[in-house]
């Protein structure tokens, strides 16, 4: 059904040929699409702050948690052990973790689309992934494509930030496994390189698509 939906969506939009960009969860979908369905007409793929393995992702998040204060580490460990993700100490620790590695509070100078209030799909996030970035216990807990990455034949641009949830190890895993790939690491960027270094990000995409068009 998923393959039929993707083919029909592309047909409806007239996307016979395209450059496929997947950011975060979108990158996971892109990897699944290329590995399992082997579609035609994909000129290149941009895998932006994404991952090929829920297990690897969780491992790297827990590694970064070790750089937090002992108080925050204990609060997170307690929440994972008890399953109580409503404790104020945990919520504060998780907020600090996300501030370090996901994104900051929008500034007054940021575009309106970033500043306006958002409706966050908490239920769908928990169902698909879990209560946070480092506890994948949802439907995607068994997402594992590391051994299939070698089957991606399209040119692949891998992007992540030095402070990203998508750590350099996660990005390097994709780079090492995808035959025709290029890796660009953004200094001092978190999970939203396109926000925190917009000019470089857009220049890179334009250059990449021109080279692979």
Where are these regions (language model features)?
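Short, small-residue-biased leader/transition segments that mark boundaries at the very start
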Residues: 1-5
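Short aromatic-enriched loop/helix-cap "lid" or pocket-rim segments at secondary-structure transitions
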Residues: 56-61, 171, 196-198
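Alpha/beta-hydrolase
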Residues: 66-154
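Conserved loop-alpha-helix segment in the C-terminal half of the alpha/beta-hydrolase fold
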Residues: 146-189
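Catalytic active-site module of serine/aspartate enzymes centered on a nucleophile-bearing elbow/loop
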Residues: 181-213
């Amino acid at each position: 059904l998923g393959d039929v939906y993707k083919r029909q969506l592309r047909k409806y939009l007239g996307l016979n040929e395209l450059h496929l960009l997947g950011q975060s969860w979108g990158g996971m979908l892109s990897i699944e699409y290329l590995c399992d369905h082997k579609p035609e007409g994909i000129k290149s793929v941009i895998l932006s702050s994404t991952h090929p393995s829920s297990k690897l992702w969780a491992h790297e998040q827990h590694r970064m948690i070790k750089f937090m204060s002992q108080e925050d580490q204990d609060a997170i460990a307690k929440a994972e052990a008890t399953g109580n993700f409503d404790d104020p100490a945990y919520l504060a620790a998780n907020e600090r973790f996300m501030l370090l590695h996901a994104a900051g509070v929008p500034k007054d100078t940021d575009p309106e689309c970033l500043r306006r209030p958002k409706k966050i799909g908490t239920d769908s996030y928990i169902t698909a992934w879990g209560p946070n970035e480092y506890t994948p216990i949802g439907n995607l807990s068994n997402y594992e494509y590391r051994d299939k990455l070698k089957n991606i034949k399209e040119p692949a641009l891998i992007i992540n930030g030095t402070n990203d949830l998508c750590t350099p190890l996660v990005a390097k895993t994709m780079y090492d496994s995808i035959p025709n790939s290029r890796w660009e690491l953004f200094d001092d960027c978190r999970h939203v390189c396109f926000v925190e270094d917009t000019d470089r990000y857009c220049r890179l995409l334009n250059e990449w698509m021109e080279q692979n068009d």
